[in-house]
From Swiss-Prot:
SMART domains: Cpn10 (SM00883). CDD domains: cpn10. GO terms for biological process: chaperone cofactor-dependent protein refolding. Belongs to the GroES chaperonin family. Together with the chaperonin GroEL, plays an essential role in assisting protein folding. The GroEL-GroES system forms a nano-cage that allows encapsulation of the non-native substrate proteins and provides a physical environment optimized to promote and accelerate protein folding. GroES binds to the apical surface of the GroEL ring, thereby capping the opening of the GroEL channel. It is found in: Cytoplasm. This is Co-chaperonin GroES. PANTHER family: 10 KDA HEAT SHOCK PROTEIN, CO-CHAPERONIN GROES. GO terms for molecular function: ATP binding; metal ion binding; protein folding chaperone; protein-folding chaperone binding; unfolded protein binding. Heptamer of 7 subunits arranged in a ring. Interacts with the chaperonin GroEL. It comes from Heliobacterium modesticaldum (strain ATCC 51547 / Ice1).
């Protein structure tokens, strides 16, 4: 994948929820919740500050993160699904 997000945007590969529950029940696609965890696959160069400097991002490629449920833009590249979102929509690193 060759994508370079702009400014403080981040590209994530969503980590899908388990197919089975702890009791072995298979969860159908219609009942699955939208993923809120992902792996960072690309980061922008940072947000431009008022003084002209760039604020470094707090996440890096390879980090596993939790993000807001309805944030970002879903895209498909080479048959794989990704999410582009602003760094501020990332809630925590795992």
């Amino acid at each position: 994948m060759n994508i370079k997000p702009l400014a403080d945007r981040v590209v994530l590969k969503p980590i899908e929820a388990e197919e089975k529950t702890a009791f072995g029940i298979i969860v159908p696609d219609t009942a699955k919740e939208k993923p809120q965890q992902g792996e960072v696959v690309a980061v922008g160069i940072g947000r431009l500050l008022d003084n002209g400097e760039r604020a470094a991002l707090e996440v890096a490629v390879g980090d596993r993160v939790i993000y807001s449920k309805y944030s970002g833009t879903e895209i498909k590249i080479e048959g794989k699904e990704y999410l582009i979102l602003n760094e501020r929509d990332i809630l925590a690193k795992l």
